Each structure stands twice: as C-alpha cells, then as structure tokens.
C-alpha cells in the first residue's frame, strides 16, 4: 500500500541524505549536531517506513542498498528544491544571497576581482564561496552544494573527462577552448636548443594531480607515440606548477593552458611559452573546452542564470 508523506517526519530525509553523503552514522551525526544514537534511531525509522535496510554495514562504512542508490538523485533534487523554497525571500532581495562556485584555478582568479565586484554591485549583501574544482565537484553540484562549476574538460577519445560522459543531470556550456602550452623560465637551457619533441622530453616535468589522477591527455598522446615524460614533481594545480616553473636554479618544465598567460602577467612571472611539439591531429586530442556546468534543476534559477551570463561576458575575450 502506498504510504502518505504526512506519516513521515521530513527531518528524517535530511538525515537520510547526510548518511548517503557521509556513509557513516558518526559523521552524519556530527554534521547534524546530534548524537550517533539519535542518527541510528532515525535510520531505524527510515528502514521501517521504506521497508528496506537502506544501508548495509561493511568494513569501509555504510553501503547503500539498490533502493537507496535508486533514490539518491530524487532525494538530492528534493533537498535542493526545499532549500530554494526556504530561500525564496532571499531571491526577492539581495540580502543573504549566497553564490557557491567550484572552479579551476587560476581560471577563476584571472577575472575574479571583476566578477566579485559585479556580484557585490548587484547584491551588496551577498556572500561568495569558491572551492577548487576537484574529483567530487560534480557530486557537489548534484547535491546542491555548488551553484556553478567552471573548469576544463578533455577531448582525447579515451579520456574520462569528455563532455559526452557528463551525467544526464548536468547541463553545460563551453565558453572557450584552449590548448596546453609549455612554460619555461626565461633563462631555461631548453630555450637555447631547437624546440622539438626530443628537447621537450629531455628535461624534467612538473605535472598536476587532476581529479585524483597524476596523468592526463598529454600523457595519453605521448603513450600512443611510445614516449613518456619524466615527471619529477607533481603539484595540485596549474597555479602552483607555473609558480614553480618560474623559480631559479632548476630545469623543470610546466604544461598549462595558454589562458595562463594572463595569470603570469598579473603576477609578473618570468615565463616563456612554447607550443607542444606535436602535429595537428595530436594537438586536437589535447584541446581543452573550458565549460560552465550546473544541475538541470537550476536551468531556470534567476540567480544562476545571471551568474552564468556575467561569467560569459567576463571571459568572452578568450573565445
């Protein structure tokens, strides 16, 4: 028999979502500021109401049952719509409005001063939270923790970061496409040599850890050629790799998108750019579409529509 929602304490659904996110009674309790015992009691009520275990205890934490996995997206949508409903007065007035972004750095930072000024000009009491784009950022968008993502995807046919592989619940718009270039200190010894593949591979490289992976499409292209970089240093992102490449007394190379030229100019980094020594077909596999991403449920959200259009205008010179 179908149960009525009036027989369910809706606070239990918040508990259910946190359990799904944390996979731990203790961690969910900490986020709810209650005891683990209280969360266990809530889980017991949920199991009774849904007539399903919902989670199974394993050495790695709580593992969701098939029913729970099937409900995850609907639960996230319901929580997001509830938050938007409760936040409705703030959408009518600038006071209390929050902007939550997950963005690649330095991509967001090269125009962030202008972006923040426009936000505060339109919404003087708004708050802005920017987190680095990471392996779990798409999940954060799905959960409603992030309004908008801004990051590069990949074009290599074997990449896991293709736009075509995005979840169906995610909408996107490509703002511009860019190619990675090689960045060298102004007095780097490679600049005294003929710039070719042998020179590129002769020197040690700085790589970045991208969504929990130490390699990316560049390494796939090299592998297809039977070649490999000597990765001497791995750093969290392009910002750090460019900073290190500019330091004296080493022969490290960094590889980063050409848009980083603006970041280098802003911070007066003594770097010179050289194109990757590949043919046109190989470079095509390295094209990076820099993309805005949001959840479909926010496609008609006035705040997010305004934010998207503002970012598009600020970055239009790169398209």
UniProtKB/Swiss-Prot annotation:
HTH lysR-type domain residues: 8-65
SUPFAM superfamilies cross-referenced by the UniProt entry: Periplasmic binding protein-like II (SSF53850), Winged helix' DNA-binding domain (SSF46785)
Residue ranges the UniProt entry marks as DNA-binding: 25-44
Superkingdom of origin organism: Bacteria
Signal peptide: none
Pfam families per record: HTH_1, LysR_substrate
Keyword set includes Acyltransferase: no
The entry's keywords: DNA-binding, Transcription, Transcription regulation
UniProt keyword annotation of DNA-binding present: yes
GO function term, MF aspect, one: DNA binding
InterPro entries membership: LysR-type_TF, LysR_subst-bd, Tscrpt_reg_HTH_LysR, Tscrpt_reg_YidZ, WH-like_DNA-bd_sf, WH_DNA-bd_sf, YidZ_PBP2
Task performed by this protein: Involved in anaerobic NO protection.
Family: Belongs to the LysR transcriptional regulatory family.
NCBIfam families the UniProt entry points to: PRK10216.1
Protein name according to UniProt: HTH-type transcriptional regulator YidZ
Native source species: Citrobacter koseri (strain ATCC BAA-895 / CDC 4225-83 / SGSC4696)
């Amino acid at each position: 028999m179908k149960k009525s929602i009036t027989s369910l304490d809706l606070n239990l659904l918040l508990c259910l979502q946190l359990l799904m996110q944390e996979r731990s009674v203790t961690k969910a309790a900490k986020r709810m500021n209650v005891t683990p015992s209280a969360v266990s009691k809530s889980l017991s009520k949920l199991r009774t109401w849904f007539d399903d275990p919902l989670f199974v205890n394993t050495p790695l934490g709580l593992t969701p049952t098939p029913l729970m996995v099937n409900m995850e997206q609907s639960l996230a949508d319901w929580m997001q719509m509830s938050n938007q409903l409760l936040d409705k007065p703030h959408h009518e007035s600038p006071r209390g409005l929050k902007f939550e972004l997950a963005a690649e750095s330095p991509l967001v930072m090269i125009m962030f001063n202008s972006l923040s000024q426009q936000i505060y000009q339109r919404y003087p009491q708004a708050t802005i939270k920017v987190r680095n784009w990471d392996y779990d950022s798409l999940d954060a968008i799905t959960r409603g923790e992030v309004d908008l993502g801004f990051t590069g995807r990949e074009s290599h046919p074997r990449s896991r970061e293709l736009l075509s592989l995005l979840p169906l619940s995610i909408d996107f718009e490509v703002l511009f496409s860019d190619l990675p270039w090689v960045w060298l200190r102004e007095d780097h010894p490679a600049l005294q040599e003929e710039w070719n593949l042998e020179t590129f591979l002769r020197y040690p490289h700085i790589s970045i850890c991208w969504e929990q992976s130490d390699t990316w499409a560049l390494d796939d292209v090299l592998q297809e050629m039977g070649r490999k970089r000597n990765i001497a240093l791995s750093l969290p992102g392009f910002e750090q790799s460019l900073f290190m490449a500019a330091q004296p007394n080493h022969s490290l190379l960094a590889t980063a998108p050409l848009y980083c030229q603006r970041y280098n100019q802003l911070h007066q980094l003594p770097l010179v750019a050289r194109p990757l020594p590949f043919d046109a077909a190989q470079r095509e596999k390295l094209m990076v579409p820099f993309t805005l991403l949001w959840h479909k449920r926010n496609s008609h959200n006035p705040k997010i529509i305004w934010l998207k259009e503002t970012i598009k205008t600020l970055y239009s010179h790169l398209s």
